[in-house]
């Protein structure tokens, strides 16, 4: 019993903090008054009790990548991960595992924020470099209302030992992001240290709440090791908790949110003999392999993730590679003391509930780690409640509304009072 008590003392420092890194201080102002007609081709409106409810569609990019304790160098090309050559999404959520090696000094010591700073710097440069060359030379075209930059901004970045999640939005969306918060759960050594577990982040965009869970579950390819992974999932869903807010109307638990996505190195393996697994991988028999995929089997048997969804997997297993190569671990020769690890889809992205539609589910090919990154693109519906015209006229002159009408022809904007 005493090791757990010792660990809990450590956790008060290492996991107990709700602090996170962001480009702006959290926006908790509930007095958001709409100033635009939201004349966007993506929106549709419904009249309701003298207010107007608008449904907007946003694109959300989600990725997960176990980087194997590798610190990225300044020249790492993020194009493969972020696909910045494509039309940018509105929101980017990037999850990482093993951003630091999982040795005792990192697990028991304070978090090395230099590593997360390095990753965030690479992400910022990649996202904003893509946007700038395509902007109009007129400064007014590159900024939203009140001069808010269109550059992508980090609204939440949180690291727990080797787990890092970082969330980025277009700069003009920031005024409508409220109540960002984090929740860390350790499931590792002694059942509570942060070498395994999750970092969950939540925020509200307009009237819709989001929760993203970045996790690293128990490893192991032996029979019944999946039971420990199932236990980790249940612990994460049970123990993750967020503040309810001053009005006690904010979601507290993960599944209470409107849009929920679970991503990470879930570590589920393929329940087939190693040699058979390798042969099926070589012949790209994905369907046969997926029939024996532990995550899918556990979901189908009702052991975990009831009501969750995953997109169609059409890519090769993402683990375990020889770093800086296209060869799976063990394909050449074994050392006597090496463990045999068959290929598996360890890295996954799944979601819960309605309001999310997945359009892409792929893997990247960056080779610095023994894992390949996995990424997905969703569209999501966002609810916006517009106040009555009398309220608007109390705050805004006709001249101001006329100017907002001009802005509406290009984009939609809100302001806070």
Swiss-Prot record:
Stretch list, region Catalytic 2: 339-354
EC code: 3.1.3.36, 3.1.3.86
Region Catalytic 1: start-end pairs: 258-273
One of the GO biological process terms: phosphatidylinositol dephosphorylation
Phenotype upon loss of function: Increased salt sensitivity with reduced production of reactive oxygen species (ROS), reduced Ca(2+) influx, as well as decreased fluid-phase endocytosis.
Superkingdom of origin: Eukaryota
Molecular function terms from GO: inositol-polyphosphate 5-phosphatase activity; phosphatidylinositol phosphate 5-phosphatase activity; phosphatidylinositol-3,4,5-trisphosphate 5-phosphatase activity; phosphatidylinositol-4,5-bisphosphate 5-phosphatase activity
Protein name per the record: Type IV inositol polyphosphate 5-phosphatase 9
Taxonomic classification: Eukaryota, Viridiplantae, Streptophyta, Embryophyta, Tracheophyta
């Amino acid at each position: 019993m005493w090791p757990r008590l010792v660990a809990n003392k450590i956790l008060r420092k290492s996991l107990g903090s709700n602090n996170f890194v962001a480009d702006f201080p959290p926006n908790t102002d509930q007095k958001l008054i709409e100033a635009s007609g939201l004349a966007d081709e993506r929106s549709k409106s419904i009249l309701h009790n003298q207010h107007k409810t608008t449904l907007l569609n946003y694109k959300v990019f989600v990725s997960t990548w176990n980087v194997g304790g590798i610190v990225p160098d300044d020249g790492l090309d993020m194009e493969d991960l972020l696909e910045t050559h494509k039309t940018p999404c509105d929101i980017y959520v990037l999850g990482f595992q093993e951003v630091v090696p999982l040795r005792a000094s990192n697990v028991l010591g304070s978090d090395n924020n230099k590593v997360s700073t390095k990753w965030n710097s690479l992400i910022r440069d990649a996202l904003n470099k893509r946007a700038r060359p395509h902007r109009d030379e007129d400064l007014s075209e590159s900024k939203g209302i009140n001069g808010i930059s269109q550059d992508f901004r980090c609204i939440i970045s949180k690291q727990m030992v080797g787990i890092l999640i970082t969330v980025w939005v277009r700069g003009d969306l920031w005024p409508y992001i409220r109540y960002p918060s984090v929740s860390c759960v350790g499931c590792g050594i002694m059942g509570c240290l942060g070498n395994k577990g999750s970092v969950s982040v939540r925020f509200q965009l307009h009237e819709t709440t989001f929760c993203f869970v970045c996790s690293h579950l128990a490893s192991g390819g032996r029979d019944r090791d999946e039971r420990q992974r199932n236990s980790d999932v249940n612990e994460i869903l049970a123990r993750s908790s967020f503040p309810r807010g001053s009005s006690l109307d904010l979601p507290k638990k993960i599944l209470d949110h409107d849009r929920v996505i679970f991503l990470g190195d879930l570590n589920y393996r393929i329940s087939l003999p190693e040699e058979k697994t390798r042969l099926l991988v070589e012949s790209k028999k994905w369907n046969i392999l997926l029939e024996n995929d532990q995550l899918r089997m556990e979901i189908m048997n009702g052991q975990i993730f009831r009501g969750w969804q995953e997109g169609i997997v059409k890519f090769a297993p993402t683990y375990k590679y020889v770093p800086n190569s296209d060869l799976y671990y063990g394909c050449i020769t074994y050392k006597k003391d090496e463990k045999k690890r068959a290929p598996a889809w360890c890295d996954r992205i799944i979601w819960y509930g309605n309001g999310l539609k997945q359009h892409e589910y792929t893997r990247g090919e960056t080779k610095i780690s023994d894992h390949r990154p996995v990424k997905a693109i969703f569209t999501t519906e966002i609810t916006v409640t517009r106040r009555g015209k009398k309220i608007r006229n109390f705050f805004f002159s006709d001249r101001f509304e006329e100017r907002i009408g001009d802005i509406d022809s290009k984009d939609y904007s809100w302001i806070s009072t």
